[in-house]
């Protein structure tokens, strides 16, 4: 009986929490249907223990199952008091978001705020309040939504223009949006508003000033119009699109069934199961903490489009970047041609000297707004240009940004060749119509497998990824938790061009770098055809799983 208690009042749920085994906590609550707020002999609930240990995943699970945040132990400590003792920001944030009272006192009247001051954890406390969107007194922080349009006069003096820009930027994020941390900014449409406002003024200036005064550049204007409108089309396509939300289990019964099934298969762990969505994680998916959803083939969360980039909108995002980068130089050329044709010779003003040279000073003197907007648009090419190059490189390597940045964390990357063989076998054996005996897809996949993964000589050593063993988080005398990863190697561009996921032998085991890499050409064909062509055509990333049972063999399947 998991509800039996020992001499200290600990039941199975307490012990699972002590060992920071979040998946066992989830299993006991859903399969065992244990009461969540049972206290031990000292009045400590499982939520208090999880908060004290800084186990944010267990805290999240317990809160989702109705754990109370207002319970007190024998000393009058609430779960928030214990979270303050540990000082873990995520635990503090989750408990505050659950409605914990920051003014609740213990037997001596000491509140969590008093304790945080004594422990000198004010900085973490402020960040946790910001995460929970609370003010310093624990009240919900209000953000004004009044629309305000202010037209500032444009001065020639560049320092004043820069100061104006900084004032507007800082004023918006500090007083209008009332953000405290960079993460707060990512949860607002501020960055995408910067782009959209720039796009609006670019279109307005082109229609109002440039089009009529540069009519001799007919094809340049046509090219700009096509590029501008197409870029906006794909931009809003990426913004408004479903990036690839995976299906979450909505009912309690379906959630319970999913937990039990994963536990029976030995796969109830954070790598294969999302405790936020209470659903199995498809291969290459990730739970976005900003959107609070799991995204199939997750690439990254992009604040510039206020959306995630995933299976459904990745192509639209890259097409937008390409069109944007090709349209901005055309717009700048039209702007400077307009200024060159119409601006008179610069007339120096003794009281207001200009140090930019006669040409630029003349442009600013004639039309400061258009000149500034042209330079601002060129400046805006920096981040999309770098991002576009990185994205193209990753497409050529068949990696997502998430995989490239967290390579050592993914079980299907850096694994042995058997992972690649299972993936190819799932693609060539499941669908009899597409992958029957002798079908070109099957032959192509097998040939690519042989070309990309059979070399084992030390001469082929290019990249090594090795992950050290992780020790589980313990309680009491148990050892702590730490990770380690090592990376060495080179020749990434050569790998990209020839498409070989070369390996090196470590401790007698061959290591494959990326099971999805079939070479530059095949990777690009698969990406730009939206998975309808190439060796991995027909893959449904919403139900494509690679799961490795504890002590068993990995399996892959396509549905």
Curated annotation (Swiss-Prot):
Enzyme Commission number(s): 2.3.1.225
Domain DHHC residue range list: 272-322
Keyword Transferase (UniProt): yes
SUPFAM superfamilies to which the protein is assigned, alphabetical: Ankyrin repeat
Transmembrane segments: 148-168, 192-212, 217-237, 316-336, 373-393
GO CC, alphabetical: early endosome membrane; Golgi membrane
Topological type in the membrane: Multi-pass membrane protein
Reactions accelerated catalytically: L-cysteinyl-[protein] + hexadecanoyl-CoA = S-hexadecanoyl-L-cysteinyl-[protein] + CoA
ANK repeats: 8-38, 42-71, 75-104
Keywords attached to this entry: Acyltransferase, ANK repeat, Endosome, Golgi apparatus, Lipoprotein, Membrane, Palmitate, Repeat, Transferase, Transmembrane, Transmembrane helix
Top-level EC class as recorded in UniProt: transferase
Intrachain S-S bonds: none
Compartment(s) of residence: Early endosome membrane; Golgi apparatus membrane
Function, in words: Palmitoyltransferase specific for casein kinase 1.
Family per similarity comment: Belongs to the DHHC palmitoyltransferase family. AKR/ZDHHC17 subfamily.
Domain notes: The DHHC domain is required for palmitoyltransferase activity.
UniProt name for this protein: Palmitoyltransferase AKR1
Species whose genome carries this gene: Mortierella alpina
């Amino acid at each position: 009986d998991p509800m039996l208690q020992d001499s200290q009042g600990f039941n199975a749920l307490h012990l699972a929490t002590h060992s920071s085994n979040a998946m066992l906590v989830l299993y006991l609550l859903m399969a065992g249907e244990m009461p969540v707020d049972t206290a031990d002999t000292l009045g400590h609930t499982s939520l208090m223990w999880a908060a004290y240990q800084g186990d944010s995943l267990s805290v999240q699970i317990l809160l989702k199952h109705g754990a109370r945040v207002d319970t007190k132990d024998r000393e009058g400590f609430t779960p928030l008091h214990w979270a303050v003792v540990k000082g873990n920001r995520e635990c503090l944030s989750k408990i505050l978001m659950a409605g914990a009272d920051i003014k609740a006192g213990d037997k001596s009247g000491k509140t969590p705020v008093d304790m945080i001051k004594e422990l000198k954890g004010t900085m973490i406390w402020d960040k946790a309040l910001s995460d929970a969107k609370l003010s310093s007194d624990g009240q919900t922080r209000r953000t004004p939504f009044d629309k305000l349009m202010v037209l500032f006069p444009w001065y020639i003096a560049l320092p004043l223009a820069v100061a104006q820009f900084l004032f507007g930027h800082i004023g918006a994020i500090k007083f209008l949006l009332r953000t405290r941390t960079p993460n707060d900014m990512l949860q607002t449409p501020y960055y995408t508003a910067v782009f959209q406002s720039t796009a609006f003024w670019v279109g307005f200036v082109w229609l109002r000033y440039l089009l009529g005064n540069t009519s001799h550049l007919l094809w340049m204007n046509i090219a700009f119009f096509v590029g501008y409108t197409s870029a906006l089309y794909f931009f809003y396509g990426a913004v408004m699109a479903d990036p690839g939300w995976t299906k979450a289990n909505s009912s309690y019964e379906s959630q319970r069934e999913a937990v039990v099934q994963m536990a029976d298969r030995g796969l109830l762990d954070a790598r294969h199961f999302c405790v936020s969505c209470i659903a199995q994680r498809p291969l290459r998916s990730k739970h976005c903490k900003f959107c609070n959803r799991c995204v199939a083939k997750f690439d990254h969360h992009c604040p510039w489009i206020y959306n995630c980039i995933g299976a459904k909108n990745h192509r639209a995002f890259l097409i937008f970047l390409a069109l944007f980068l090709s349209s901005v130089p055309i717009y700048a050329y039209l702007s400077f041609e307009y200024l060159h044709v119409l601006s008179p010779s610069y007339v120096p003003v003794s009281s207001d000297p200009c140090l930019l040279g006669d040409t630029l000073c003349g442009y600013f003197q004639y039309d400061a707004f258009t000149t500034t907007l042209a330079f601002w648009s060129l400046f805006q090419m920096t981040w999309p240009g770098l991002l576009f190059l990185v994205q193209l490189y990753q497409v050529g390597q068949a990696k997502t940004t998430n995989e490239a940045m967290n390579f050592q964390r993914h079980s299907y990357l850096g694994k042995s060749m058997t992972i690649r063989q299972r993936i190819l076998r799932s693609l060539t054996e499941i669908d009899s119509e597409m992958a029957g005996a002798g079908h070109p897809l099957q032959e192509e996949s097998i040939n690519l497998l042989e070309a990309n993964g059979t070399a084992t000589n030390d001469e082929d050593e290019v990249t090594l990824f090795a992950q050290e063993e992780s020790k589980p988080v313990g309680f009491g005398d148990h050892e702590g938790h730490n990770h380690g990863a090592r990376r060495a190697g080179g020749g990434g561009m050569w790998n990209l061009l020839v498409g070989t996921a070369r390996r090196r032998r470590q401790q007698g085991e061959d290591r494959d770098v990326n099971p999805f890499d079939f070479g530059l050409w095949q990777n690009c064909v698969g990406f730009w055809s939206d998975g309808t062509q190439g060796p991995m055509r027909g893959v449904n990333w919403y139900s494509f799983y690679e799961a490795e049972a504890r002590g068993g063999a990995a399996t892959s399947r396509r549905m």
